[in-house]
Swiss-Prot record:
Described purpose of this protein according to its UniProt entry: Plant non-specific lipid-transfer proteins transfer phospholipids as well as galactolipids across membranes. May play a role in wax or cutin deposition in the cell walls of expanding epidermal cells and certain secretory tissues.
Protein origin, superkingdom: Eukaryota
Key words of the record: Disulfide bond, Lipid-binding, Signal, Transport
Keyword Signal: yes
Protein name in the entry: Non-specific lipid-transfer protein 2
UniProt-recorded Gene Ontology molecular function terms: lipid binding
Disulphide-bonded residues: C27-C73, C37-C50, C51-C96, C71-C110
Gene3D superfamilies per record: Plant lipid-transfer and hydrophobic proteins (1.10.110.10)
Keyword match Disulfide bond: yes
GO BP, one annotated term: lipid transport
One Pfam family per UniProt: Tryp_alpha_amyl
InterPro entries xref list: Bifun_inhib/LTP/seed_sf, Bifunc_inhib/LTP/seed_store, Plant_nsLTP
Amino acid sequence: MEMVNKIACFVLLCMVVVAPHAEALTCGQVTSTLAPCLPYLMNRGPLGGCCGGVKGLLGQAQTTVDRQAACACLKSAASSFTDLDLGKAASLPSTCNVNIPYKISPSTDCSKVQ
């Protein structure tokens, strides 16, 4: 019986060590996914492929950590582009018929995003 317990512990240890470590979305992933939105959000072009990017980001942000990381990146981007139309940014989810759990705005508290 002791040998069975040792084998079970070894198998459990291997499962923990080998399990993939999930990492939050990076700002690079978020910005590349939403790059098609920039012309639209800066009043320089049509909506084009923007909604595909918004829907793609929604699909990538499956966990709370991912959603908070995406929120922080979008918040930072919204603050850094001086000619970004914040009204268009805030309405982007409804324009693209998607539901995200936060407003795209420099004032969003990303720590509260679930």
